[in-house]
Amino acid sequence: MDTSSVGVLLSLPVLLQLAAGGGSPRPGTLLRGCPAHCQCEPDGRMLLRVDCSDLGLSELPSNLSVFTSYLDLSMNNISQLPPSPLHSLRFLEELRLAGNALTYIPKGAFAGLYSLKVLMLQNNHLRQVPTEALQNLRSLQSLRLDANRISSVPPSCFSGLHSLRHLWLDDNALTEIPVQAFRSLSALQAMTLALNKIHHIPDYAFGNLSSLVVLHLHNNRIHSLGKKCFDGLHSLETLDLNYNNLDEFPTAVRTLSNLKELGFHSNNIKSIPEKAFVGNPSLITIHFYDNPIQLVGRSAFQHLPELRTLTLNGASQITEFPDLTGTASLESLTLTGAQISSLPQTVCDQLPNLQVLDLSYNLLEDLPSFSVCQKLQKIDLRHNEIYEIQADTFQQLFSLRSLNLAWNKIAIIDPNAFSTLPSLRKLDLSSNRLSSIPVTGLHGLTHLKLTGNHALQSLISSENFPELKVIEMPYAYQCCAFGVCENVYKISNPWSKGDNSTAEDLHKKDAGVFQVQDERDLEDFLLDFEEDLRALHPVRCSPSPGPFKLCEYLFGSWLIRIGVWTIAVLALTCNALVTSTVFRAAVYISSIKLLIGLIAAVNMLMGVSSAVLAGVDAFTFGSFAQHGAWWEQAVGCQVVGFLSIFASESSVFLLTLAALERGWSVKCSAKFETQTPFPSLRATLALCALLAGTVAAVPLLGGSEYSASPLCLPLPFGEPRATGYMVALVLLNSLCFLVMTVAYTRLYCHLEKGDLESMWDCSMVKHVALLLFTNCILHCPVAFLSFSSLLNLTFISPEVIKFILLVIVPLPACLNPLLYILFNPHFKEDLGSLGKQTHFWTRSKHTSLMSINSDDVEKQSCDSTQALVTFTSASIAYDLPSSSGSPPAYPMTESCHLSSVAFVPCL
């Protein structure tokens, strides 16, 4: 007599009791057998479902109803099971003991459970499969032993489990396949041995599992397979060998004639041999990406008529497209990260049912015609070497919805390349070399990406893309055509189209919503309603225009425009005048006047850059979006940016040098009562020019930050590199102003009262002090702006930032010459000398300057406080001028030994 018959006989008294009591037990009778703190409910079949999970139980509950069909004891603290604790539960079909502390299950623990179909023992501390406790559970269909510490499976532990369909042994410590234990599981259909430590699968490891359909062996340490390890698996359809240490292709799979899904990705397989799947005609899906595959036989995937998906990622050494003859059902093909340089012309003849083609990250240069692949819905060809898209490449692909051609070298696209793609919704052409884009056939696009095509500078009309929702452009100005530059999107309203509509008209239009006179009115109304919906959901275009990239004007506000024009005019005229008077009027140029002249020259460069920006604003007035991209990428923009930074830094460096020169001059005059030239002036000037040029060239070397905005200046926000550059400039200039301040503070501290007025050339000392004060004051807003950006302080409005960059920064270029013209007496003297020279040169162009009357020369020398003296000896003697209240002049001797030089005493 078998066990099931015994179970029926043992339950017969219970059945007789039920019959005597009038049939099925009442709900009240069932619930009286519910343990304390557990939740019980009828299952609709005269039986009881008992849930005692997560109650902290340390032992099995008592007083369980004999009619219990479902018992959940998971997530408790049960550490051991007594013999036959549940023998009376003859109707129990599902027992859950997961998440407890069981380390051992004794024999007889499940005795009497003749109806048990599901047993869950996962997440315990079992170190081996119970040797005898599971035997003779003839009704058991599902057994979960996963997430334990099982390292041993006794040979006879599964004997008697003739109905077992599903077995979980994953996430344990198995090191080998328990071949003997599996021989009694002839009805097993699904088994997982994943997440163990198995190294090898021997021959005939699953020999008696003829009904097995699913086998998971992933995440083990399998490095070798027996050539006949899968023999006997006549019904196997899914085999998972992913995430192992396989070094060779598993040729043992050729015996699996019914295999439909095969995965062996993330291994160390280096090659796939010819006719690798010759014994697997039923294969539908193959996953073998993330293997260091170097060689794939051309016939490896031939004659797989059921194959639907083929995925091969990261096969970096594949150079030829595989031969797919006889694999006509393929719907998805992914071959990425290889070195395929060309596709066969017959690729679509072999794959007429292809729907998804992913050949990204290859070396494709030329493309065949895909017109035969009528079912293609998605093509991904990004990151290749494609140069040209011909007219027939994508012709008549009526089902194509997504086309990705990003990160290629595409410079030419035939005007009709997209003309027969009515279903195309997503097109990605970003990061190519396009200068224009055809629009024929693209009316149905909803997503368009063109970013990274720096040669594509023209505007694209929004009328060509009526269904567009998302678009990415190379330049922000191109988004102006899609209305993103407006602050508020104005929704066209069919009830208020006219500004002069009367109340009666509005009433008629309102009534027209509910009463449509004829079909024509209905069509017009629907068209207007569709326009309103489109207005409610405008196109999302990026990068969007902003306060520094406007659609209509370069400067934006008239305050900035007038300020830039004023600075440009004053800087050019005043600095030109100062430069002329310094370098053309004087017979001899002292060190300080040379520095003043050079400051005027570099300030004139700043005026040139401001004038160019003002000219661009005037030329593009009202239509800057049409020229913004061209201007940003033009060489002129980079030249303007370079000149601005070079002029600004040179001016600061020269002013620093002038302050040091004045301090040196005053020190020498106080000590020797004579003026001594500043040492190594030419070398210092060359160093200043070199340093300023280097500072101005940094944005060019670091990726042309000058082209980041149409203002052609590094913006003190956004990219960390630009912010760091601006902060570095501010710190450098602040250091210069600190040096100047210290030098002049020492100068004034060492002078006694009245000494400054009695000094030679005191006007130049005062002039440099005035320049220092003015430039330092104007430097403060720039420094505040840069450090605010560094600290992410966002309370400064964009208009204020633009005003600082365009007006405050170049303002010293016009104030410096104005201060010299208005307050320095040397200018009037030099201007008079320049006028006399001009008058003289006009009267006598061929007469030498030496013919000037000696009296005029002497008078000019006195008026300009300059005299030309040639020293031919080491001892220098001259008369010093006396000031009011000072003793008469007396001769002085300079202790410095000099060669013959021109020297100008102070007056």
UniProtKB/Swiss-Prot annotation:
LRR repeats lie at residues 44-64, 65-88, 89-112, 114-136, 137-160, 162-184, 185-208, 209-232, 233-256, 257-279, 281-303, 304-327, 328-350, 351-375, 377-396, 397-420, 421-444, 564-585. Pfam families: 7tm_1, LRR_1, LRR_8, LRRNT. GO terms for biological process: G protein-coupled receptor signaling pathway; positive regulation of canonical Wnt signaling pathway. It is found in: Cell membrane; Golgi apparatus, trans-Golgi network membrane. Residues 575-593, 660-682, 745-767, 824-907 are cytoplasmic. Disulfide bonds join C34-C40, C38-C52, C348-C373, C479-C541, C637-C712. Residues 22-553, 615-638, 704-723, 789-802 are extracellular. It comes from the Eukaryota. The keyword Mitochondrion does not apply. The chain crosses the membrane at residues 554-574, 594-614, 639-659, 683-703, 724-744, 768-788, 803-823. Glycans are attached at N63, N77, N208, N500, N792. Residues 33-64 form the LRRNT domain. Its main location: membrane. PROSITE patterns: G_PROTEIN_RECEP_F1_2, LRR. Keywords: Cell membrane, Disulfide bond, G-protein coupled receptor, Glycoprotein, Golgi apparatus, Leucine-rich repeat, Membrane, Receptor, Repeat, Signal, Transducer, Transmembrane, Transmembrane helix. Residues 1-21 form the signal peptide. One of its GO terms (cellular component) is trans-Golgi network membrane. It is a multi-pass membrane protein. GO terms for molecular function: protein-hormone receptor activity; transmembrane signaling receptor activity. Receptor for R-spondins that potentiates the canonical Wnt signaling pathway and acts as a stem cell marker of the intestinal epithelium and the hair follicle. Upon binding to R-spondins (RSPO1, RSPO2, RSPO3 or RSPO4), associates with phosphorylated LRP6 and frizzled receptors that are activated by extracellular Wnt receptors, triggering the canonical Wnt signaling pathway to increase expression of target genes. In contrast to classical G-protein coupled receptors, does not activate heterotrimeric G-proteins to transduce the signal. Identified in a complex composed of RNF43, LGR5 and RSPO1. Also interacts with other R-spondin ligands, including RSPO2, RSPO3 and RSPO4. PANTHER family: GLYCOPROTEIN HORMONE RECEPTOR. Belongs to the G-protein coupled receptor 1 family. This is Leucine-rich repeat-containing G-protein coupled receptor 5. The gene is LGR5.
